Amino acid sequence: MTPARRRHDELQKIPGVGPSLAADLRLLGVTCVADLCDRDPEGMYADLEELMGAHVDRCVLYVFRSAVYWAGTSAPDPELSLWWSWKDGGEAERRGLMPQARRAATT
C-alpha cells in the first residue's frame, strides 16, 4: 500500500468521512487524523469554500466539527461521533461543546 493510500484510508476511519470528504480534508492539508487535533472546523469550512470557489453544503461543516472532536478525544462518545450531532442546535450544542465562535454568534 502506498503512503498516500494509507493516509487516505486513515482519514476514512473517522466516522462520517468517506472518499470525497477525505479528499476535501487533504485539500486543507490534513493528511492524518492527528492533523485535525485543535483545528477550527468553521475555519476549515470557510477555507474549503474559498478553495472551491463556491458554496459548500453545510453538512460538510458538521462533519468537520465531528471529525475534530473525534480526533482530539481519547474516548469519543459514540453519539457525538455522528456528524448530525454537530448540526446547529444538535446534541453537541446542547452539551455546550460547540466551538466558541459558533456559540457567540448564536447568543
What are these regions (language model features)?
Residues 1-15, 19-107:
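C-terminal extensions
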